[in-house]
A protein has these predicted regions:
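Alpha-helical transmembrane cores and adjacent cytosolic helix/loop segments
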Residues: 1-174
């Protein structure tokens, strides 16, 4: 069972990592080329997702080590530590998105910033992100339920956070 659990966990983390790499590259490029600060900010968010997915991979690899003299019960507690790391990233991302949103609304109200029309590419990548993250959320949540892995539960919540950010980007682009 442990081998199946480790395989499912690794597969889920790798799928999320690959998806975030692709989304980060696309959103950052389209945000720049499509003149959409909202999509660019979402691309930077996806880049930070890549960074902590790499950290999660390292934690998960270490958590799979067998028990030894110094750790007679094994290294599985690293999964909980990894979940805390993901939670810290989610909290930081949420605070950053909130602050940027308040700042943008303030600038629109006082007239410093004016609304701009973004390209169809910006809207397309925002919609694609919504669909991809929705799929990743349900898959990761399901795998977390099967494996009882706290890190996967945290990653599922991060996908949910990204879904909400994508909705905000879609609204901002439209």
């Amino acid at each position: 069972m442990t081998r199946d659990r480790d395989f499912l966990t690794s597969l889920t983390v790798n799928l999320g990592l690959f998806s975030n790499i692709v989304l980060a590259a696309l959103k950052t490029s389209i945000g720049i080329l499509g003149h959409s600060p909202a999509v660019l900010a979402d691309g930077i968010n996806s880049t930070s997702d890549v960074v902590y997915y790499i950290a999660v991979k390292i934690f998960m690899k270490q958590a799979q080590k067998p028990a030894d003299k110094e750790h007679p019960f094994g290294h599985r507690q690293l999964e909980s530590i990894s979940a805390i790391v993901v939670g810290a990233f989610i909290l930081t991302t949420g605070i950053t998105i909130f602050c940027e949103s308040v700042n943008t609304v303030y600038e629109l109200i006082i007239g410093v910033e004016t609304g701009r029309s973004a390209s169809i590419w910006a809207l397309s990548i925002a919609l694609a992100t919504f669909v991809i993250k929705l799929g990743l959320y349900f898959y990761t949540r399901g795998t977390a339920g099967k494996t009882h892995n706290p890190t996967l539960r945290a990653l599922a919540n991060d996908h949910l956070n990204d879904i909400m950010a994508s909705v905000a980007v879609i609204i901002g682009v439209v």
